[in-house]
Amino acid sequence: MAERVYGEKVNIDTVNTISFYNQRAKTIKNREQEYTTVLLGDQDPEYAVKWDEYEKGFVLPKLMLNRNKVVLDLGCGMGRLADAVSDKVKEYYGVDFSSEMIAVAKQNVRNNHCHFYTMSIVDALSDPKITARKYDLVLMAGVSMYINEDELKESYRLLRNLVNKDSLFYFEESVGKIERLTLNHIWSEDLQDYYGAIYRTREEYKSLIDEYINGVEYIEEGYMNFLDKEEQTETSHWYALLQYKGE
């Protein structure tokens, strides 16, 4: 199969993706900037710092965090967002499919009210460790691009069962500007590794959310192109902040 697939819905090998992030987590101590572990940009470490600062500064004030909120972070990685929100909320639950990333998160964020689990997102949304409570805020930042279509639909559908009326969702993803683009185990000179991801379009994400989560209202959504790189002409960053109103 071609390494770059345009327009078509094809699956990526999630086993390779897990291995990719496990290996990156193991090298975190050797990195000039640890956020490149999850935000990539290995050849420009300062980009990861700028992106992290920009996203947190842009999004966190919109999340209405307080000590009564319970947060679910799906695809939490090394705890980048946990570090920013955990001391402002009642409880935080982070899930990631990379055991090595979860190990780093547990080292980085040691609050007693933070809980980290190694699971795929679709498994987590059916696991009693996660389903035992409702959440006031669900974060899915930079993770849907690593989930194949059927599993993503099921994950979005299951999310409805875990939120309260008026709960918030924050989504952020790398997206195809013009059309869907799948990188199918492609060699990256910047990362010095094989890489796979699905860059759905903004419209595709909105359609999936509307159909499978259902009952949400958009507070705001759009492109986060402040730090888009000139050489990445086919992709951008998209975000959405939504509130669950019930079916």
Question: What are these language model-derived features?
Answer:
Residues 161-163:
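Conserved helix-to-beta-strand junction in the class I
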Residues 139:
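A conserved beta-strand element that flanks and buttresses the S-adenosyl-L-methionine
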Residues 143:
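Hydrophobic adenine-recognition pocket in adenosine-nucleotide-binding enzymes
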Residues 1-67, 74-129, 147-154, 158, ...:
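Class I (Rossmann-like) S-adenosyl-L-methionine-dependent methyltransferase catalytic domain
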